[in-house]
Amino acid sequence: MSSNEKIFSVLRAPRVSEKTARLQEISNQYVFEVSNEATKADVKAAVEQLFDVKVKAVNVVNVKGKSKSFRNRAGSRGNWRKAYVRLVDGQSIDVTAKA
């Protein structure tokens, strides 16, 4: 697996919401959806390599999927993993840029 494949297998998507926008402004933190097997070291390496920034800290949270029903059938959404990435002061990522 090449390094680009490794990066894109670790980082799935940026999470953009009011809360994440506030975190970006206040504490220079960015939120990404990552693979369930990704470690903090994997996330740090992927962000530093992809966006060419210096990462100060990474916190990872496992999010449990919600129970949902559809036409009287019980089901659930999948579990996923979220990474909070704090950058060194003075650096930023444009997560809204188009590829």
Curated annotation (Swiss-Prot):
The gene is rplW. InterPro entries: Nucleotide-bd_a/b_plait_sf, Ribosomal_uL23-like, Ribosomal_uL23/eL15/eS24_sf. One of its GO terms (molecular function) is structural constituent of ribosome. One of the early assembly proteins it binds 23S rRNA. One of the proteins that surrounds the polypeptide exit tunnel on the outside of the ribosome. Forms the main docking site for trigger factor binding to the ribosome. Keywords: Ribonucleoprotein, Ribosomal protein, RNA-binding, rRNA-binding. It comes from the Bacteria. This is Large ribosomal subunit protein uL23. Part of the 50S ribosomal subunit. Contacts protein L29, and trigger factor when it is bound to the ribosome. NCBIfam families: PRK05738.1-3, PRK05738.2-4. Belongs to the universal ribosomal protein uL23 family. One of its GO terms (cellular component) is ribosome. GO terms for biological process: translation.
